[in-house]
């Protein structure tokens, strides 16, 4: 006979189990949402990276001495110390979260093969001649490099050489696999994202029409294709050919990709056309539709100048003349003329996009912003005190300041004009290829000239200053409106939109001078306008009725020591701003510009550290900045 205590215990256990089962079956939908962070995909983190970096696999980088491997490029980006091509130890102040190595697709890998004297190079007499020049070094190597580049520019390279390094060849396929496999090796979802990409380097007649291509996908899809080139017979310099390549990639692989351009400032007006294209085509409905689809992002700042605005186009903006390159096109074969500027700068392109959308139904210049280095040293360095130059030939030395980047009979891009810039901040919920790509595509990004300040920008109809005091302002931002890159639609009322913006300094950089909102709009008569508003300023300065502060923040830079102090400016700024000039019948865009207090440029560090003798024209001090992607308002 069973013990009564055992029976009782078993019975009690059964009752409890049944009760627990009943309770479990009564779990409601509200219960399932108890944990506030479960299933949350709100972008709470900003991930920093360089979307434009070259290794020695790029023709120009390799010819001018870049021997730093693609693997070392990733190691530096991830925080390791490596040596530059000249043997100088280099390390980033902080690791990056992601990187896109974008080697030029044209003649990819040829420079290293010529220098190494591979069998296929030695079999072609002219290529063997170049190899011998590099082998001798010094003047002979320089002459070989310029002779090769000259033949490339004039399209007079040996046909067999072009064939060897074009899509479909064994050599081209080998180099592409090297690039893809390196990205696969260094990609660690959640820790570091290594995108697969390349640069399509269209430069007809010296007009810079370059685009970088980024793939969302892994090697299994990337290796089903080969990059598009610009050299005939397989390549093309027409962006329409690139759009077709992207279309084919997505159709044939099931993957996703997009392109983004850079350095409109070196295109002599052809980067953002409004009527005709350089190739003789027209800016018609097909063109604007394709460009809107395939180019959702723009590299607004980098080593070859800042591309936000120009004082000729924005004469009332005292911050527009920042790191401006104004001499000519990329090879200075044609001088710059004022009428070209309209097709070169991002702010003007945003404005022209509103007009084209009204005319043709699509806005081809509806892009988000990012920054990049475009370094050809394999070194993704963007800090003023850690500047390793555009190419290996201008790595740190006291004389590099005097070496022009490009020169011709028409002028020169002087060495001191190079810019230690920039990086892209991406708002995403995790550090993976998919999450970062999607954020770039939806334009939830911002570009900086190097510093990693935190910037949030939301637009809606009901923000108030109390929203900034919430324990999670971003949650309120998403709930009541749209983030940077988003769209506001026309309301029935005449209520003006409000914008919640806040910025925090980079903890390793300078305090903030101000936050500005830049607005562009298309009025009812078809005219374009722009206006700059100071919306939050440091040090208790006053913003007057015109929306501007008349008092400068000051300058603490010591020119003798290349130092500054954070005794001016604020560590963070925030506000909720309502457009005082809003008309619901006028389409518009808004973006923020966050400006630091003055700090030394890299040339001043060269003077203090290396004893460089600076030209009197060299700017010693600048105000670094961030540009948020715009928020658009449609009056349709």
Please tell me what each predicted stretch does.
Residues 223-225:
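Blade-edge beta-strand/turn elements of extracellular beta-propeller
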Residues 1-23:
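Gram-negative bacterial Sec-dependent N-terminal signal peptides
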Residues 214-216:
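Long, charge-dense tracts
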Residues 148-152, 167-175, 208, 230-260:
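Cap/lid and interdomain-hinge subdomains that line or gate substrate/regulatory clefts
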Residues 125-162:
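Aromatic- and acidic-residue-enriched carbohydrate-binding clefts of CAZyme catalytic domains
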Residues 78, 136-141, 231-236:
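Aromatic/His-enriched, Gly/Pro-containing loop or helix-boundary segments
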Residues 25-70, 74-131, 165-168, 178-190, ...:
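C-terminal functional module detector
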């Amino acid at each position: 006979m069973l013990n009564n205590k055992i029976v009782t215990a078993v019975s009690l256990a059964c009752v409890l189990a049944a009760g627990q089962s009943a309770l479990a079956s009564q779990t409601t939908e509200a219960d399932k949402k108890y944990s506030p962070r479960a299933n949350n995909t709100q972008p709470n983190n900003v991930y920093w990276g360089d979307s434009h970096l070259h290794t020695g696999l790029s023709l120009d980088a390799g010819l001018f001495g870049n021997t730093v491997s693609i693997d070392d490029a990733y190691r530096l980006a991830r925080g390791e110390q490596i040596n530059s091509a000249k043997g100088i130890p280099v390390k980033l102040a902080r690791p990056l979260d992601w990187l896109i190595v974008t080697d030029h697709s044209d003649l990819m890998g040829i420079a290293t093969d010529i220098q190494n004297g591979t069998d296929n190079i030695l079999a072609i007499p002219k290529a063997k001649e170049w190899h011998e020049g590099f082998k001798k070094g010094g003047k002979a190597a320089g002459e070989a490099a310029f002779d090769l580049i000259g033949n490339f520019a004039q399209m007079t390279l040996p046909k067999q050489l072009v064939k060897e390094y074009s899509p479909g060849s064994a050599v081209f396929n080998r180099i592409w696999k090297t690039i893809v496999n390196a990205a696969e090796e260094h990609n660690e979802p959640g820790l570091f994202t290594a995108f697969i990409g390349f640069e399509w380097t269209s430069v007809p007649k010296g007009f810079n029409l370059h685009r970088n291509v980024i793939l969302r996908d892994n090697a299994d899809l990337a290796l089903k294709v080969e990059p598009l080139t610009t050299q005939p017979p397989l390549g093309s310099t027409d962006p329409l050919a690139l759009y077709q390549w992207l279309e084919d990639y997505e159709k044939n692989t099931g993957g996703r990709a997009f392109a983004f351009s850079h350095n409109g400032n070196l295109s002599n007006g052809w980067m953002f056309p409004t009527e005709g294209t350089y190739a003789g085509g027209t800016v018609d409905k097909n063109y604007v539709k394709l460009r809107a689809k395939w180019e959702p992002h723009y590299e607004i700042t980098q080593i070859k100048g800042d591309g936000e605005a120009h004082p000729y186009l924005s004469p009332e903006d005292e911050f527009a003349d920042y790191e401006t390159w104004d001499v000519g096109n990329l090879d200075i074969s044609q001088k710059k003329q004022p009428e070209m500027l309209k097709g070169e700068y991002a702010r003007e392109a945003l404005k022209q996009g509103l007009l084209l959308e009204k005319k043709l139904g699509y806005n081809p210049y509806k892009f988000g912003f990012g920054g990049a280095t475009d370094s050809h040293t394999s070194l993704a360095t963007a800090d003023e005190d850690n500047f390793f130059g555009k190419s290996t030939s201008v790595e740190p030395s006291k004389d590099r300041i005097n070496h022009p980047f490009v020169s011709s009979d028409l002028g020169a891009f002087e060495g001191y004009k190079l810019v230690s810039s920039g990086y892209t901040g991406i708002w995403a919920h995790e550090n993976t290829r998919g999450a970062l790509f999607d954020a770039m595509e939806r334009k939830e990004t911002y570009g900086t000239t190097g510093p990693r300040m935190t910037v949030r920008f939301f637009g809606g109809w009901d923000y108030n200053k109390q929203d900034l005091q919430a324990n999670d302002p971003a949650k309120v931002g998403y709930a009541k409106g749209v983030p940077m890159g988003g769209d506001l639609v026309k309301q029935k009322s005449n209520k003006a939109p409000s914008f919640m913006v806040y910025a925090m300094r980079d903890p390793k950089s300078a305090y903030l001078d101000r936050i500005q909102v830049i607005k562009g709009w298309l009025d009812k008569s078809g005219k374009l306008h722009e206006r700059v508003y100071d919306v939050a300023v440091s040090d208790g300065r006053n913003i007057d009725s015109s929306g501007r502060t008349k008092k400068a923040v000051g300058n603490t830079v010591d020119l003798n020591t290349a130092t500054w102090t954070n005794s001016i400016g604020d560590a963070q700024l925030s506000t909720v701003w309502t457009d005082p000039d809003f008309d619901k019948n006028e389409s518009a865009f808004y973006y923020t510009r966050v400006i630091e207090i003055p700090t030394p440029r890299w040339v001043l560090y060269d003077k203090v550290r290396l004893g460089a003798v600076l030209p009197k024209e060299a700017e010693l001090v600048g105000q670094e900045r961030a540009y948020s992607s715009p928020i658009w308002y449609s009056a349709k």
